[in-house]
Amino acid sequence: MVHETRSRTLAASQEEGKAAPKKQKTESKEQEGGQQAPSKNKKTADNEEHDGEQEPSKNKKLKAEESDLNGKATAVKEFSEFCKAIREHLTIEDMRKILQGNEQDASGSEDAVVPRCEDVMFYGPLDKCPVCGGQLECKGLKYNCTGTHSEWACCSFSTNNPSRRGGPIKVPDDVKNDFVRKWLKQQEGNKYPKRNLDDEGIFSGMMIALSGRMSRSHGYFKEQIMKHGGKVNNSVIGVTCVVASPAERHQGGSGGFAEALERGTPVVSENWIIDSVQKKEKQPLAAYDIASDVVPEGRGLPLGNLDPTEEAIETLAAELKLAGKRAVHKDSKLEKDGGHIYEKDGIIYNCAFSVCDLGGDINQLCIMQLIMVPENHLHLYYKKGPIGHDQMAEERVEDFGSRFNDAIKEFVRLFEEVTGNEFEPWEREKKFKKKCMKMYPLDMDDGVDVRHGGVALRQLGAAAAHCKLDPSVTFIMKQLCSQEIYRYALTEMGHDVPDLPIGMLTDLHLKRGEETLLEWKQDVESAPESGPAADAFWMEISNKWFTLFPTTRPYTMKGYEQIADNVASGLETVRDINVASRLIGDVFGSTLDDPLSQCYKKLGCSINRVVEDSEDYKMILKYLEKTYEPVKVGDVVYSATVERIYAVESSALPSYDEIKKLPNKVLLWCGTRSSNLLRHLRDGFVPAVCHIPVPGYMFGKAIVCSDAAAEAALYGFTAVDRPEGYLVLAVASLGKEIQEITGTPGSEDVKRMEEKKMGVKGVGRKTTDPSEHFTWRDGVTVPCGKLVPSTNKDGPLEYNEYAVYDPKQVSIAFLVGVKYEEQNMEVVPDE
């Protein structure tokens, strides 16, 4: 809806801005026909004499505008006639030779070569791309670079006024054509005309039909189509596409809409016209398709084109199709026949790949498997296509029978075709080099993604009924072992592709993601701030990340905040979900009678319910109430109430007995997603992956906590439809030396703090009232106090944050289960 509203607003402003030129064109046509346009204000002889000085200047201006319009029309007409002549007199082979002779791209099909040659011969040879040195090519109303910025990215440079070389066109001697020689002779000494793409049509060669009630009149859209080179037809027969309002599909559709569905004619939103005109380039019809999912056999809408809420519903409910390295893909239909992944000489023949190139509008995946079914029948399963759009994918199952060697050869051939790399060096040694426009392997591990192996919603009751743990512990284990929290986490980050096991990747793949992040961190500091080079830099970063960790909605990230929110935070969450997958395993695929108890044992962690009348419970409740501020989502404000509290003692963490011997101990809040909790309980808190100069990562490789429950709630808040989450209370020793920071520390400062492993306090704009702080037990300070303004009014942090660089100085003490509730909610009594 936001997209639609913006487009309409822009279209309205364009329509108003075009009013004057439309009038001038009418006047020009009347004058061309020999008729003088009638004046609205007829002048007397006296008036004419009085205005005698002004009239010539007005006439001169009108004539200049008329001449300019006629000149543009003449240039377009001359080019059109030249194109017809070129196609008549030159062969495709001649055109290729002329392009090569002028250092232009001569590759591609006839449809690519012909317009390229016409442009070069009439307007002059194009200079190379100023960003990457590639070849420019006219596409729509812009010249786009066809080169590559790196192996990860196509060049994104585009312009409507490209630089061209001077001098005559070079025609190779073996092009024997009198027409070309004669035409070149005529052009000697003349300058090349300048190509004005705005005068040419976006919709050139297209016949378009309009259907049903639209947001604007049919007359408006008809004018836009015809003004940009297209034609409008009243019938659906023979048209390129039918344009309709998105509301048509919900209202049953008009006659034209229904007829288009029957004929298989594309039906697109009116925004296709608006956006094509706005962007000065014909947009792909598939991206504006509003009818495919109406037809039962239709292609369906890509997940990336759905409303984000609809996409979330689709992916949350979707069955995970590929759960790990040994899992048979669901779409092959061979699992039900007893199929399993073929393995020979230590190689498991199951590969997944992806590639994202935003400049080339590419976001694809590929799956290849050799599947053995009973009676030694070997099948090759192959799937390749756009991520989130199964109906557009190329997909096949090929039965090789007992021809095992042939199946392996075909698998290896496809691997090399898809990636440009050899198969065995990758599988045996993980040697791989990304090739331009080729896919990159998603290194799956031998296990089961928690979205498949975890407890499904309908299985929760049975799992809890068989659990021998204390009911209060069963409750939390049921939450942490369910599929739901991990599905939601991946959905919120956009990494919920059903075809790919993002929750079962190798440590090597995750390490590559971390190394990539660290490289970017260094490169960003010296990256250009604006211009084509900056665009290319950020596009390459985005392409690389969304190739390593695929999504249905890739976009170009820019700035430290987006790297922190999407890359750093995303990597940490995917890493922790992978740990959960290994801990939980395949709950109901195993023979375990009590999977929840088994997972609890693997944690190596003691979890016990804190009773409500205990001193610890009362202390924590007071600490939360004092340091919490409501979370605001849109216009709704949410408060947090304590549901239950658990005391935690983990064998992986420093014990409380060890921590209590350390200096400057503080009980602090830590916010985390529920999907990250199993990792924290098993391994303790892990320092942030790197230093990024934004809150959350500004202290570098540190464990960051706060004295404000409000700060932790910002990380722990889930969603309005999932109001339950967990906050963590940990005892942290800040060491003997504590440094206070009021601003954003620089790279050198962070490096020094990491090396010294000192305790750091980042002073927020709000702080807890020191007069209310108290000591808990064994000298542990509880900074519990009302949130008040601090003296650091211009600091980057809203609340105080504490950074600890040594994981041995932090121990999780409590898990606080909270429920977020809407404040000031009006309750309507039953009548």
Curated annotation (Swiss-Prot):
Reactions mediated catalytically: L-aspartyl-[protein] + NAD(+) = 4-O-(ADP-D-ribosyl)-L-aspartyl-[protein] + nicotinamide; L-glutamyl-[protein] + NAD(+) = 5-O-(ADP-D-ribosyl)-L-glutamyl-[protein] + nicotinamide
Binding site for Zn(2+): C129, C132, C145, C155
Domain BRCT: 200-290
Domain PADR1 zinc-binding: 49-199
Induction: Induced by heavy ion irradiation.
The family this protein is said to belong to: Belongs to the ARTD/PARP family.
The enzyme's E.C. designation: 2.4.2.-
PARP catalytic domain boundaries: 594-827
Domain WGR per the UniProt entry, residue ranges: 338-439
Keywords: ADP-ribosylation, Glycosyltransferase, Metal-binding, NAD, Nucleotidyltransferase, Nucleus, Transferase, Zinc, Zinc-finger
A GO cellular-component term linked to this record: nucleolus
Species of origin: Oryza sativa subsp. japonica
Entry keyword annotation includes Ion transport: no
InterPro entries hit by this protein: ARTD/PARP (IPR050800), BRCT_dom (IPR001357), BRCT_dom_sf (IPR036420), PARP1-like_PADR1_N (IPR049296), PARP1-like_PADR1_Zn_ribbon (IPR012982), Poly(ADP-ribose)pol_cat_dom (IPR012317), Poly(ADP-ribose)pol_reg_dom (IPR004102), Poly(ADP-ribose)pol_reg_dom_sf (IPR036616)
Region named Zinc ribbon: 124-168
Stretches assigned to the PARP alpha-helical domain: 466-585
GO biological process: double-strand break repair
Record's keyword annotation contains Iron: no
Compartmental location: Nucleus
Function (record text): Involved in the base excision repair (BER) pathway, by catalyzing the poly(ADP-ribosyl)ation of a limited number of acceptor proteins involved in chromatin architecture and in DNA metabolism. This modification follows DNA damages and appears as an obligatory step in a detection/signaling pathway leading to the reparation of DNA strand breaks.
Region: Disordered, residue numbers: 1-69
GO molecular function: NAD+ poly-ADP-ribosyltransferase activity; NAD+-protein-aspartate ADP-ribosyltransferase activity; NAD+-protein-glutamate ADP-ribosyltransferase activity; nucleotidyltransferase activity; zinc ion binding
Gene name linked to the record: PARP3
Protein name: Protein ADP-ribosyltransferase PARP3
Ranges of compositional bias, category Basic and acidic residues: 15-32, 43-66
